[in-house]
């Protein structure tokens, strides 16, 4: 939005215009670290049941389909959770939403650690999913609303690299505590909810959200804090603005202007998420079908997680240079190629080679997509827009373990199962082609 002069002589300036001239400061780094580790916690929580699945299955004597249902329970909780937190984050703010989500997750995750039956564990994991959805909805929206325009794409992709760190923590906690019980594994994981205090101390509220709420002074406080006083604008003499939509309205997402965006991003989310999660959720079991022991499988997954980091870093540099769409299409396409090759692996060396390529490009694409999705919507509906995409992801997350569990229960081969999963990546590429480019554009 460009600058305007009102009849009263007050200059109106879009918040996005302020961020075109804002330098990257230490305050951005502090806020970024707080939000980054919130995303790490999210990945940790999603992976912990998968990594402890063999212990839980042995304790409750679970068949593959029932274990798949347990793995998917947290994602079923995230379906209503994302929709709920999408409205909350647009109404009460990004910061409060993230703090409340982390705190409530910690309590519910701790409750799941004392489960004495399969169904108690299932429902407490479901409730944990509802609670953790607030972090999921707010992380990328919150971070990109704090960043200068020139740094937004690259820095937000770095945020996505918290996923493999969360995976590695889940592997480490499970490996260290496997000899005790899965109860201790979940109990230790629940302590991550205390990170809410770090978010409270380290990150300001989003200026975009504050302006949309009419909180001019709160927005200006955040801008002064983030810029460390190094703005060319005199904030005391301007009125900040954002594009106006009905705040937190799901209906706005399905009106003529935004419906094509909502339909396309939902389609990308379903296919892309299936192409990743259907494989990740059953990777320990799939590796056992190829003859790997549990320690060998943990090592395979850990090494694969390490390969994700250069994928994120490469995608971060490339998206800032060439934009979202080109890099997203190229990376998902190559991930699909490596996925089909992984399905045909006959030796351990081939499995490592093709899986490294698969996760390098897949996770690089996820970093771009997590950044891009929030940029597609204006401020007043960014939270609910992002939450719809995440809800579709969680539907995909919930269905994928069930379907793959069904296939494995019928002794479907490794090759056919992984090829089926990789087909969804092709669908994600097709839908991505029709989305608009947002690199270098201000948020509205």
What is each of the regions a protein language model found here?
Residues 2-444:
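Transmembrane-helix signature of 12-pass secondary carriers
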